[in-house]
UniProtKB/Swiss-Prot annotation:
<feature type="binding site">
    <location>
        <position position="207"/>
    </location>
    <ligand>
        <name>Zn(2+)</name>
    </ligand>
</feature>
<dbReference type="InterPro" id="IPR037518">
    <property type="entry name" value="MPN"/>
</dbReference>
<feature type="compositionally biased region" description="Basic residues">
    <location>
        <begin position="31"/>
        <end position="42"/>
    </location>
</feature>
<dbReference type="InterPro" id="IPR020891">
    <property type="entry name" value="UPF0758_CS"/>
</dbReference>
<dbReference type="InterPro" id="IPR001405">
    <property type="entry name" value="UPF0758"/>
</dbReference>
<feature type="binding site">
    <location>
        <position position="220"/>
    </location>
    <ligand>
        <name>Zn(2+)</name>
    </ligand>
</feature>
<feature type="region of interest" description="Disordered">
    <location>
        <begin position="13"/>
        <end position="42"/>
    </location>
</feature>
<feature type="binding site">
    <location>
        <position position="209"/>
    </location>
    <ligand>
        <name>Zn(2+)</name>
    </ligand>
</feature>
<protein>
    <recommendedName>
        <fullName>UPF0758 protein BamMC406_2419</fullName>
    </recommendedName>
</protein>
<dbReference type="Pfam" id="PF04002">
    <property type="entry name" value="RadC"/>
</dbReference>
<comment type="similarity">
    <text>Belongs to the UPF0758 family.</text>
</comment>
<feature type="domain" description="MPN">
    <location>
        <begin position="136"/>
        <end position="258"/>
    </location>
</feature>
<dbReference type="GO" id="GO:0006508">
    <property type="term" value="P:proteolysis"/>
</dbReference>
<dbReference type="GO" id="GO:0008237">
    <property type="term" value="F:metallopeptidase activity"/>
</dbReference>
<feature type="short sequence motif" description="JAMM motif">
    <location>
        <begin position="207"/>
        <end position="220"/>
    </location>
</feature>
<keyword id="KW-0479">Metal-binding</keyword>
<dbReference type="InterPro" id="IPR025657">
    <property type="entry name" value="RadC_JAB"/>
</dbReference>
């Protein structure tokens, strides 16, 4: 008797026992599907900064990038907005804040405070350096703008001396003291000694009034007179004493007091 396998292709005439076993079903826990990351680029400040530049970010978003994470139960953007609001939404006021202000703000802490202090100091030095490069001593307006930028928003009184050569070129700028002129250790003899070391032919002195009022006090006028007379002994000239406020200045020279 002929085998039925002779009438059909061999592949169709296999013994069922020889057929390959069906793949076993996976009976364990389902494998989690990999989620494709969402495209957050239109939303996250870091990505927008890299793609569109820092001008695309708000002040609060720039601060949020510095903070990195939130604190005090807030997300990082709420922390950034709260910090900025503390300075009246003014980056300029934030730039001139005392270092301990950041550390005492809720949710900031020591590490974030250090970052903010470093960044604000870098920004302030860059602005002062840029203004100094463009400073024209023969232009009273430029000198006053420079001084306003340097000390106008300081929360304490700062005494600054500009040492000039015979052509009124800038030799050096020094902050001599801090506090208030009634308690600040401003010693005319030290300024005169420094002028001799630098071979300065002329000086401009300045200090700020944190109150914003620029009307000179009696102590301001007395110090100006003493320093003017002391510099005359070494053939150096006091060109001006500028009192600096947050938005205005007072010039002794312009007022005819020198």
């Amino acid at each position: 008797m002929l085998s039925p396998c002779l009438a059909v292709p061999a592949t169709e005439c296999r013994d069922p026992a020889d057929a390959p076993a069906a793949p076993a079903r996976h009976t364990g826990p389902a494998r989690p599907r990999k989620r494709r990351p969402r495209n957050w680029k239109p939303h996250l400040p870091r990505e927008r900064l890299l793609e569109r530049g820092p001008a695309a970010l708000t002040d609060a978003e720039l601060i949020a990038l510095l903070l990195g994470t939130g604190g005090g139960g807030r997300d990082v953007f709420a922390s950034a907005r709260a910090l900025l609001a503390r300075f009246g939404d003014s980056l300029r006021d934030m730039l001139d804040a005392e270092p301990d202000v950041f550390a005492t703000h809720p949710g900031i802490g020591t590490a974030r405070s250090a970052v903010l202090i470093a960044v604000t100091e870098i920004a302030r030095r860059a602005l002062v350096e840029k203004a100094r490069e463009r400073l024209q001593i023969d232009s009273p307006g430029a000198v006053e703008d420079y001084l306003r930028l340097r000390i106008g928003t300081r929360p304490h009184e700062v005494f600054v001396t500009l040492y000039l050569d015979a052509r009124h070129g800038l030799i050096d700028v020094e902050e001599s003291a801090r506090g208030s002129l009634t308690r600040m250790a401003v010693y005319p003899r030290e300024i005169v000694r420094r002028a001799l070391v630098l071979n300065a032919a002329a000086l401009i002195i300045a200090h700020n009034h944190p109150s914003g009022a620029v009307q000179p006090s009696a102590e301001d006028r007395r110090l100006t007179r003493v320093l003017h007379e002391a510099l005359a002994l070494i053939d150096a000239k006091l060109l001006d004493h500028v009192v600096v406020g947050t938005a205005d200045t007072f010039s002794f020279a312009r007022a005819g007091w020198l």
